[in-house]
């Protein structure tokens, strides 16, 4: 058993227990969201130099050098003296500038954040309802847009998503984190074909990636497959078809798994439809966004279809357990 010293109080950390779980078990409130080392909401700082390297995966080198770590991924092997970072140093103030219902479940939230200097289309931010409650949402916008765009899907027991859908108003101010994440478009291989596969609101980062690639004159073929259980779950269909008509190298295929094929969409899961159309992905760059089970399965299938591992980029939308929504 190791000890955690926080604000001059000492807490016990059981063998194999994460710092986040240990503190939560003993009544300490630590901001958290995904609890899987992705969103970085639970970032803390150690006064010592004994931070396990795995607890710093995904953090910027400047943060690693200052002994910042992710509490959900830190399983200490020795005692640690830790602290929570000052939220004023890491959060940005944003104003709601637009609210647009995309379908029955998904709303597009527009945020103006003048202090945000730069980001990559397809990255994600943490949206804060209050100082301790946040959720991660991917950016559907590109840096040249006048405001950030998020696609927020309503979940039945989602404290954050229901608040966004039912209570958020244009003009409201809230706090967000700086964008993070590695699922974005990089120029430099303009002829490389791109395969984008998403489910549900996983279309959000793919929209950002798609628009960014087209804005940077990507010349290779770009194929986007967006899947839903039924046709009502699809959205931005007209906009995407219009883009496909405007850009000869862009092809859009909506997919519905619980329906037969029609002139409006293909029948089947997006990943299956995509890989049936593109069985050999050697030399392709692949982006996978949405349901984590789909992302996990599609990553394996893309690799077996000869896509290089370093050409497979993923953003899995991990749903928080109902008790913590």
Predicted regions and their residues:
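Anionic-ligand-binding alpha/beta catalytic cores of soluble enzymes and soluble regulatory domains
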Residues: 84-86, 212-213
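A short, basic/flexible loop-to-alpha-helix module at the beginning of a structural domain
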Residues: 179-188
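Histidine-anchored nucleotide/phosphate-binding helix
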Residues: 205-215
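Ferredoxin-reductase
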Residues: 91-173, 177, 192, 228-230, ...
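Reductase modules of NAD(P)H-dependent flavoproteins
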Residues: 1-80, 225-325
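Short, surface-exposed secondary-structure boundary micro-motifs
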Residues: 47-50, 85-87, 130, 179-180
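Short, conserved phosphate/pyrophosphate- and ester-handling motifs at nucleotide-, phospho-/glycolipid
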Residues: 122, 202, 291
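Structural motif
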Residues: 193-195, 223, 285
């Amino acid at each position: 058993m190791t000890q955690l010293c926080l604000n001059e109080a000492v807490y016990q950390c059981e063998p194999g227990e994460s710092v986040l779980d240990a503190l939560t078990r003993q009544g300490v409130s630590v901001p958290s969201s995904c609890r899987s080392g992705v969103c970085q909401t639970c970032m803390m700082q150690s006064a010592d130099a004994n931070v396990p390297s795995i607890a710093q995966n995904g953090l910027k080198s400047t943060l690693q050098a200052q002994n910042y770590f992710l509490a959900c991924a830190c399983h200490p092997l020795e005692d640690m003296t830790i602290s929570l970072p000052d939220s004023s140093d890491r959060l940005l103030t944003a104003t709601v500038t637009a609210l647009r219902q995309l379908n029955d479940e998904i709303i597009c939230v527009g945020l103006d954040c003048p202090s945000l200097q730069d980001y990559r289309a397809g990255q994600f931010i943490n949206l804060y309802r209050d100082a301790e409650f946040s959720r991660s949402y991917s950016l559907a916008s590109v840096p040249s847009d006048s405001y950030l765009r998020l696609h927020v899907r309503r979940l039945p027991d989602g404290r954050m998503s229901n608040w966004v859908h039912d209570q958020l108003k244009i003009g409201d101010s809230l706090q967000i984190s700086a964008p993070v994440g590695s699922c974005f478009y990089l120029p430099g291989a303009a002829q490389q074909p791109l395969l984008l596969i998403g489910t549900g609101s996983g279309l959000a980062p793919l929209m950002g990636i798609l628009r960014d690639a087209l804005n940077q004159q990507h010349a290779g073929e770009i194929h986007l497959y967006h899947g839903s259980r039924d046709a009502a779950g699809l959205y931005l269909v007209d906009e995407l078809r219009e883009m496909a008509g405007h850009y000869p190298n862009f092809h859009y295929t909506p997919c519905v798994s619980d329906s037969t094929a029609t002139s409006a969409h293909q029948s089947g899961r997006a990943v299956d439809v995509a890989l049936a159309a593109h069985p050999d992905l050697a030399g392709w760059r692949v982006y996978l966004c949405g349901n984590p089970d789909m992302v996990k399965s599609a990553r394996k299938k893309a690799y077996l279809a000869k896509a290089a591992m370093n050409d497979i980029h993923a953003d899995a939308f991990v749903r928080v357990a109902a008790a913590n929504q």
